[in-house]
């Protein structure tokens, strides 16, 4: 079992937040594309080192890597969510199968861009045998909710609710010069 936390160096975290703060529209993605590409490569290399550290320190067979990347812009109303992180490069660096681009595919199919949360919530509720119906609140950077009504009928729904920890993180970065999340 691996119980380890892999933190971005402060300088790298600042670069991510600085670039994210500049990108407020779809057009900004093009304006800052050179910076995005450089940061994406740096992030992917960091994640490849994390994957290799995990592989080295476990005796478990790893079938594939799920790679979310780092959200830099998100606007489901315009059917776009941009994460930096190159799944193909991560696959090359780790020599493993990498599954990626979760959010954009979900948005293109009418979702909010968080396709894994409801699937995980449904499996968790079923495994620990929670009585239905149930509502699960996930407070991450953006809060989302999963409502599960019935397993047999596959009756469940999920959606974003609004800001979660991102507001606290932004306040701490601005006022305390540190990181919350």
What are these regions (language model features)?
Residues 61-119:
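Glycine-rich phosphate-binding loop and adjoining helix at the ATP-binding site
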Residues 58, 127-128:
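Glycine-rich helix-loop-beta junction characteristic of Rossmann-like nucleotide cofactor-binding loops
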Residues 26-87:
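Short beta-strand-loop/turn "lid" adjacent to the catalytic site in phosphate-handling enzymes
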Residues 49, 53, 89-92, 123, ...:
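Residue-level signal for well-ordered alpha-helical scaffold segments within enzymatic catalytic domains
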Residues 1-18, 99-127, 135-181:
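Glycine-rich phosphate-binding loop plus the immediately following alpha-helix
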């Amino acid at each position: 079992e691996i119980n380890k936390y892999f933190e971005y160096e402060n300088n790298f975290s600042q670069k991510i937040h600085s670039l994210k703060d500049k990108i407020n529209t779809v057009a900004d993605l093009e304006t800052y594309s050179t910076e995005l590409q450089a940061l994406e490569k740096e992030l992917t290399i960091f994640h490849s080192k994390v994957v290799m550290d995990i592989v080295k320190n476990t005796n478990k067979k790893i079938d594939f890597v799920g790679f979310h990347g780092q959200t830099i812009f998100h606007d489901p109303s315009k059917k776009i969510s941009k994460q930096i992180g190159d799944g193909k490069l991560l696959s090359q660096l780790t020599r493993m199968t990498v599954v990626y681009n979760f959010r954009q595919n979900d948005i293109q199919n009418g979702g909010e861009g968080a396709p894994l949360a409801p699937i995980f919530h449904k499996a968790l509720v079923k495994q620990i045998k929670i009585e239905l119906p149930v509502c699960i609140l996930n407070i991450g950077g953006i809060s989302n909710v999963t409502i599960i009504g019935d397993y047999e009928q596959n009756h469940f729904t999920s959606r974003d609710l609004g800001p979660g920890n991102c507001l606290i993180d932004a306040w701490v970065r601005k006022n305390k010069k540190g990181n919350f999340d």
